Amino acid sequence: PKTSWEKCPLCQARIRKEGLKGDKEHSAEEKLQSYFVQRMEKVVNKHGKKMIGWDEILEGGLAPSATVMSWRGEEGGIAAASMNHDVIMTPGSEGMYIDQFQGDYKINPVSIGGFTTAERVYKYNPVPDTLAAAGKGHFIKGVQCNVWSEYLYNTDIMEYRIYPRILALSEIAWSPLDRKDYKDFERRLDNAQVRLDGHGINYYIPQPEQPNGSCNFVAFTDKATMTFTTNRPMKMVYTLDGTEPTPESTVYTAPFDITETTTVKIASVLPSGKMGKPRTILVEKQTLAPAKEVAKTTPGLDMEVFDGMYLSVNNLEAAQKTGKKQVIKTTRELTNQVPAPESMRGVKQYAAIATGYVNIPEDGVYYISSDLEEVWIDGKLMVNNGGEVKRFSRHDTSAALAKGLHEIKLVFLGHIIGGWPSNWNDGSVQLRKSDAEKFTPITAEMLSH
């Protein structure tokens, strides 16, 4: 907000009235924040209460009796404790944000991002060594995990985020350092999960994950080697005949090869016999889709723009064409036709469709990932994010593609679903060859029409 205060006439008037001036350490707007916090502190203290504030309250000068909640790393907490202020440690950089993912984001409910396992939470020490050495450790009054709710659309998802990481939080808050033992915590977690079952709590069970990003559609030309891991030691069972796995199904012990089109169903099993949600993975044998014979192309994609906000492609198909056409050099231009500020106030929404060719560099199976509404290759719908919160490309697919030009169609719908504006995405389409570890974006040099 301090950036907004620079343009706010009322804020600037208050700065002048109070004689607040910026210096080398703090801007006038930070001084305004300190003025406000200290003024509020007097109100709070008058009613027998004590102020607690996020570590931003350090900016501009700390209120005399305030307790600081250190969330932007530990630095704010260390600074406050060094000034003899009480501190609650809650740094996101150290795993104290348990609204973050705790498994592969490709197969988990959408989240704000980040990655924090129960092990990471458990291993955090809320009293930094620097404070302990300086005799200031007693100013750390507690530790907290945060669970922000913008992606908690129902109680089940909330519980899925919180448990079992909240159990790890309780132990780092109450257990002496010399008594902490993560392996023992894992053992006791098996028992705790039975108790959670008794209370009907929907806790996270690690799913079988594939290396380099999980995907529920695996194309291959010769054979596919299926490799799975879990981020906590866990039994995995699977079937290859389309039936649902049970605790007595074949136990996964090592990677296995598939040479014909097969449906793999695989799930984790707890010591209690309870199973996690099974994953269904279609493993399809394909021949290389042939490249197109095109006499002449020019760089970029043809793009048509439609004014207005469309929540689905069906709405877009019924829209009146505007005739707004242009050539774009990169897929990024699909999403940046209008400014997309953090507030999204006053944004004039639009949709866009881009068509042309993508040049595949060599024969192979490619995994395809994007946060756009749809990605089509050779007339086939590859990525469909319709109706979803468009973050973290959670509907990847794969295809066997020959070297050369392939038809591509990209669809962007500017709208807000689940609190996330699709305009904030970078419009990229990412490819990963099956023998590569990382996705790379389709570049301008690969696009033509």
Segments and roles (model prediction):
Residues 1-2, 52-56, 69-71, 88-90, ...:
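Generic beta-strand/beta-sheet core signal
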Residues 1-83:
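Active-site neighborhood of glycoside hydrolase catalytic domains
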Residues 18-26, 147-152, 175, 246, ...:
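Glycine- and acidic
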Residues 44, 68, 166, 238, ...:
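Hydrophobic, well-ordered secondary-structure elements that form the walls
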Residues 50-54, 61-66, 72-224, 231:
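Flexible, acidic glycine-rich loops studded with aromatic residues
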Residues 180, 186-359, 365, 369-371, ...:
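Short, compositionally stereotyped local motifs that mark structural "simplifiers"
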Residues 412-416:
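Short, charged beta-turn/beta-strand-edge "cap" motif at the junction between a beta-strand
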